[in-house]
């Protein structure tokens, strides 16, 4: 969506300062909540990554973990990857974890897009997916796991030691755990790309809070737990939600079915599929073209947004041709184990589980994989123990720079609409605005990534975080339809909008060329 200089300027000039006190954005205490079971995905999407026997791209600087061969590299995070990291770190393996992110989908994996997890043991009142992942990540880090929020681009498990190459480093290792999860499927409607992030989304929790969806009629496609959960979540913001189900019944759990069917703000359309998107003369999404699967009858349903909840595809492309996969792309493991067809390579989580796909089963498989790695290393006389002190997290002092009286433009990082108005009108620097929402897991992933890049250009950039629920008028004027979203301004001109989570080098290159 094109955002005019006039609209943003008007919003920044007219919006009254918020009277409520807001906590300051403190980048150093933000813990990344990375890529879940969907890590390493840019590479993963790239079956385009070079094959092992092809010429590999130039190697990045070697890992600073040491010049030797590491015990274990874990590719991916989520409940499988983080659990594996916890067990491996406690066993003194000092695992190297590439958390990565999911290109074209939702960083942090499926739990990062889940509102309430009500069936994970130990949380009688439930827990949000991002909060659960945050706790797991901190636990892995506390016991000595080496975490890198980087995208894996190349894997060679055909020769030893194995080689894992990310966007920033190369690591050699004796064993690998693949916990890359699965990516959200798309319908591939004729106009899907045109309206992706402009009305179509695969993440209700990321994009549902957008001011452009509030009070509107929305639709969700799918009949399982993911789709029903998205429909329920969207009723917090939408006037009404339509759930489109291809078959004549829901596949979701009985509890989720009851909640959907008894919700007056949700209408379920059985035997119905989406055929395409309909737009108005302004080029905005105005509806969905539907088709009955039983009669073939077609109709148009007026909605302002369409959300997908139609399942996932395993992120195993990096391993194609190197380990055994089934016809759907899931990694094949020996029954009851995490062992793949390659000795020393193990798989955990949704990348090898096409049946259960639960957070607790993913965590269990991560545990099995880590214990299997330890046995493998011992049996082959490869284990080198690293005894590290347990890392205790220190409380960070939180200061509020962004209330009107305390604002200081000499600082680089700020939060809230008052700060944005000040830097927008007064700063000669490039202005980077990050739009977030409270329940957005990918926002937690992006904050530390972007923060590190901003630190590199401290004298050339001003950074402001905007919570779209606290400052909806700013988000609406900027045309924000989902979070996370980054906009760059200079001299009151908007230069670029970047939706979702990207690699550090993409933000770095843009800032470098526009500072």
From Swiss-Prot:
Which Cys pairs does UniProt list as disulfide-bonded? Answer: 203-206, 440-443
* Record-annotated active site: 440 (nucleophile), 443 (nucleophile)
Q: Which reaction does it catalyse?
A: [thioredoxin]-dithiol + NADP(+) = [thioredoxin]-disulfide + NADPH + H(+)
Coiled coil where?
Answer: none
Task: Tell me which UniProt keywords the record has, alphabetically.
Answer: Chloroplast, Disulfide bond, Electron transport, FAD, Flavoprotein, NADP, Oxidoreductase, Plastid, Redox-active center, Transit peptide, Transport
Which residue ranges does the record assign to the Thioredoxin domain? 377-515
Task: Supply the InterPro entries for this chain.
Answer: FAD/NAD-bd_sf (IPR036188), FAD/NAD-binding_dom (IPR023753), Ferredoxin-NADP_redctase_2 (IPR050097), Pyr_nucl-diS_OxRdtase_2_AS (IPR008255), Thioredox_Rdtase (IPR005982), Thioredoxin-like_sf (IPR036249), Thioredoxin_domain (IPR013766)
EC id: 1.8.1.9
Q: Which GO terms describe its cellular component?
A: chloroplast
Per the annotation, how and in what number is the cofactor bound? Binds 1 FAD per subunit.
Q: Does Cell cycle show up as a keyword for this record?
A: no
Q: Which GO terms describe its molecular function?
A: enzyme activator activity; identical protein binding; oxidoreductase activity, acting on a sulfur group of donors, disulfide as acceptor; thioredoxin-disulfide reductase (NADPH) activity
* Effect noted on mutating residue 203 to S: Loss of thioredoxin reductase activity
- Necessary cofactors: FAD
- Could you say which enzyme class this protein belongs to? oxidoreductase
Alphabetical list of CDD domains matching this protein: TRX_NTR
Q: How does it assemble?
A: Homodimerizes under reducing conditions. Interacts (via thioredoxin domain) with the plastidial 2-Cys peroxiredoxin BAS1.
- Please state which protein family the record places this protein in: Belongs to the class-II pyridine nucleotide-disulfide oxidoreductase family.
PANTHER family for this protein:
THIOREDOXIN REDUCTASE 1-RELATED-RELATED
Q: What is the protein name stated in its UniProt record?
A: Thioredoxin reductase NTRC
């Amino acid at each position: 969506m094109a955002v005019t200089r006039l609209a943003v300027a008007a919003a920044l000039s007219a919006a009254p300062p918020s009277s409520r006190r807001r906590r300051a954005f403190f980048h150093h205490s933000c813990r990344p909540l990375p890529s879940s079971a969907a890590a390493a995905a840019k590479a993963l999407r790239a079956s385009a990554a070079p094959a092992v026997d092809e010429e590999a791209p130039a190697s990045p600087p070697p890992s600073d973990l040491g010049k030797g061969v590491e015990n274990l590299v874990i590719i991916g995070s989520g409940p499988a990857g983080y659990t594996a990291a916890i067990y491996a770190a406690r066993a003194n393996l000092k695992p190297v974890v590439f958390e990565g992110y999911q290109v074209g989908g939702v960083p942090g994996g499926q739990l990062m897009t889940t509102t309430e997890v009500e069936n994970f043991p130990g949380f009688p009142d439930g827990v949000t997916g991002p909060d659960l992942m945050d706790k797991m990540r901190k636990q892995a880090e506390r016991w000595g796991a080496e975490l890198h929020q980087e995208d894996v681009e190349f894997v060679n498990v055909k020769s030893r030691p194995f080689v894992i190459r990310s966007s920033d480093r190369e690591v050699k290792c004796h064993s690998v755990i693949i916990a890359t999860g699965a990516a959200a499927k798309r319908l591939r409607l004729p106009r899907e790309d045109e309206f992706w992030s402009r009305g179509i989304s695969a993440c209700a929790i990321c994009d549902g809070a957008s001011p452009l969806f509030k009070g509107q009629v929305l639709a969700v496609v799918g009949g399982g737990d993911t789709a029903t959960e998205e429909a329920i979540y969207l009723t917090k913001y939408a006037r009404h939600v339509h759930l489109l189900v291809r078959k004549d019944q829901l596949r979701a759990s009985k509890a989720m079915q009851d909640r959907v069917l008894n919700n007056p703000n949700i209408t379920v359309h059985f035997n119905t599929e989406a055929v395409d998107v309909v737009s108005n003369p302004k080029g905005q999404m105005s509806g969905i073209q539907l088709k009955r699967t039983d009669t073939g009858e077609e109709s148009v349903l007026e909605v302002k947004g369409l959300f997908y909840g139609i399942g996932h595809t395993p992120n195993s492309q990096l391993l194609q041709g190197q380990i055994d996969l089934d016809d759907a792309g899931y990694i094949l493991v020996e029954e009851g184990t995490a062992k793949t067809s390659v000795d020393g390579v193990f798989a955990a989580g949704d990348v090898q589980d096409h049946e259960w796909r639960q957070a607790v089963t993913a965590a269990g498989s991560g545990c099995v994989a880590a214990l299997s790695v330890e046995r493998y290393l011992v049996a082959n006389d490869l284990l080198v123990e690293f005894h590290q002190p347990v890392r205790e997290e220190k409380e960070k002092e939180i200061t509020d720079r962004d209330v009107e009286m305390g604002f200081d433009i000499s600082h680089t990082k700020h939060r809230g609409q008052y700060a944005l108005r000040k830097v927008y009108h007064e700063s000669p620097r490039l202005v980077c605005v990050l739009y977030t929402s409270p329940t957005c897991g990918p926002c937690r992933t992006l904050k530390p990534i972007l923060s590190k890049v901003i630190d590199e250009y401290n004298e050339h950039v001003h950074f402001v975080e905007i919570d779209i629920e606290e400052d909806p008028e700013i988000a609406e004027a900027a045309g924000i339809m989902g979070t996370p979203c980054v906009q760059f301004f200079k001299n009151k001109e908007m230069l670029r909008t970047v939706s979702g989570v990207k690699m550090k080098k993409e933000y770095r290159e843009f800032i470098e060329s526009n500072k």
